[in-house]
Structure formats: structure tokens, C-alpha cells
From Swiss-Prot:
Residues 1-138 form the (+)RNA virus helicase ATP-binding domain. Transmembrane segments: none annotated. It comes from Potato virus X (strain HB). Residues 139-226 form the (+)RNA virus helicase C-terminal domain. Transports viral genome to neighboring plant cells directly through plasmosdesmata, without any budding. The movement protein allows efficient cell to cell propagation, by bypassing the host cell wall barrier. Increases plasmodesma size exclusion limit. Acts as a suppressor of RNA-mediated gene silencing, also known as post-transcriptional gene silencing (PTGS), a mechanism of plant viral defense that limits the accumulation of viral RNAs. InterPro entries: (+)RNA_virus_helicase_core_dom. This is Movement and silencing protein TGBp1.
Amino acid sequence: MDILIISLKSLGYSRTSRPLDSGPLVVHAVAGAGKSTALRKLLARHSTFTIHTLGVPDKISIRTRGIQKPGPIPKGNFAILDEYTLDATTREAYQALFADPYQAPELSLEPHFYLETSFRTPKKAAALIASCGFDFETNSQEEGHLEVTGIFKGPLLGKVIAIDSEAETTLSRHGVEFVKPCQVTGLEFPVVTIVSAAPIEEIGQSTLFYNAITRSKGLTYVRAGT
């Protein structure tokens, strides 16, 4: 655990008052904070770590083990579970738990370490996220493009993400391909369009909206309300 704690401190994670001997080490970071990259570096440098994820696992590689789906843990290895908030039933076998608590706040634990800074989210999108009430900031140098209009007031570009059933019905009726926020956890896209039947004032503080808007690393379009 010492290696992991040293790594977290070097990456700018802040320590909470929760004692380290209180269950598994819990680490929270906002979307785009470099959590997965940091975990991959641990794997590359230290053979005693095993890292699983409930999100999207790494592609199979002949060079590295990568972050894998939950499975056997080699005896003596320090086991880490990423995206732990996606399922509360698979935590017991792990000594450390990582997640973005905003993606599933109802399943989040009190953290030992946290990081509120994203390195991926463009400045304009980050400002909108923060204005909606999330503790969120960015170190990205990209201003990005942000456009917020009614649901029928602009084109649907890039990866289209529907965040409510009415939007899904509307998109299906018009033959538009779309995904739900839960289908793109851990992924990122250069262009994202978020579609909702409700206005931004109603959806801004929702987990679904947060999950959707943090998938963008460039151009962000919000088509919400009438």
C-alpha cells in the first residue's frame, strides 16, 4: 500500500481525515483526472499489483497485463478495483477501490484520497459542470466548444448520448443512432452531443448529465428542452 500512497501524493491527490486502517483504501477522482493512466503505470512498474475494473477493460496486449475484468487474483498481490461504484457486490476481494463518485453517488464510500481536477475536460465544458454544482475543475489547455440549445435547435454531431427516455424515443423515431451514458463509462470522444427532453436547468445536477458531458474532450453540444 505504501507504493500506492506515494504515487497518489505525487499525482496531487488530497488526503481526507478518514483513517487508513478503516477498510480498503478508497480513492476518488473526477472524470479525466488520469486515474486509469496512473493505474496502468503502477502495473508496468510493479508486478505485485493486480488491477481489475467494472468499466471498460484494456485491450489484450503482448506487452503488458493491462487493467482487466474481475477474475483470479494472484496470491500475495495487492488487488485494486477500478469503477467500484458500478457494483456493490464485488468489493470484498480488493485492498483498494477507485472510482469517480459522481457517476454513481449512491454506491460511493467515504474516500481516503481524492482529486477534483480533470486534465481532459475542456475549459468551457468544465465551467458548465462546475456551475451545475459539482466540485470540478480542469487543467486542460483546450477551451473547447460548448453550445447549449433546445432539443430541435441544432445538429446532432459526434457521439450522441440520450439521457432520458423521451430523448431516446425521439431519436429512435428519427433513425438517429445514440447511446446511453452507462454505455460509454470510461470512454472519451472528440465530439459529443447530449440530448434531453428536459432543459439544462433540470438535468444539470443529474448523474446522467455528468456522465455524458465528461465523455467530451473537444466539442460539446447540449440539445435540451424545447
